[in-house]
Amino acid sequence: ATKKFTIKILKHKKNLGLGRALKTGFEHCFSIGKNDDILISMDTDNSHTVNLSYQMAKKISSNKQDLVIASRYQLTSKTKGLNKLRKILSFGAAILYKIFFPIKNVKDYTSGFRAFRLEKIRNAWKLDKNFFSEKGFSASADILIKLYKVRHKIRFGEMPINLRYDLKKGDSKMKIFK
């Protein structure tokens, strides 16, 4: 049986940053979604492979996990086209996040390619109206940490990703130094 997925493109008139984009998208899904729906966030610059989203959703629909991250730090993960400085900074940030926020089964705190059980993230959002407070690239890690702190028995997991920065459309808007 073939399943159909509904995709709706939501746009801001000007770039408000990753955090605001996530807030707009998630809150739209909260308003129309059912508890057993699966919400997927991903970059649309060609660096993420959409086919992986089916495998991520399968882990959630099989009731094994509530949040699945496409992780750069799984054994079989590959990253192509990312400069060495960004690799070093990303890996360093991952270590720091793991030290200060030791989430079981999570190594990649900043990957934006994720699948969520809608019920779990909606419940966390209802408890904290500032759930989407970060505006920039730190929003991905912030959401993960807030879900960890809520402790609604969220089962975290990861899958390896083949991240293709060499296929990326446009320049990165991430500011390494503010």
Locate predicted features.
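Short, high-confidence coil segments that cap the C-terminus of an alpha-helix
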Residues: K34-D36, K64-D66, H152-I154
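The start of beta-strands in P-loop NTPase/AAA+ ATPase cores
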Residues: T6-I7, I38-I40, D66
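Conserved residues at the C-terminal ends of beta-strands
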Residues: M42, S71, N162
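Residue-level signature of catalytic and energy-coupling elements of molecular machines
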Residues: G25, D45, R117, L147, ...
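Acceptor/aglycone-binding surface of glycosyltransferases and processive sugar-polymer synthases
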Residues: H12-S31, V50-S133, D166-M174
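Hydrophobic helical membrane-anchoring modules
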Residues: K3-K4, Q55-K58, I103, L127-K178
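Acidic donor-binding segment of Leloir-type glycosyltransferases
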Residues: A1-L10
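Short beta-strand-to-loop acidic/aromatic patch adjacent to the donor-nucleotide binding site
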Residues: N35-S47
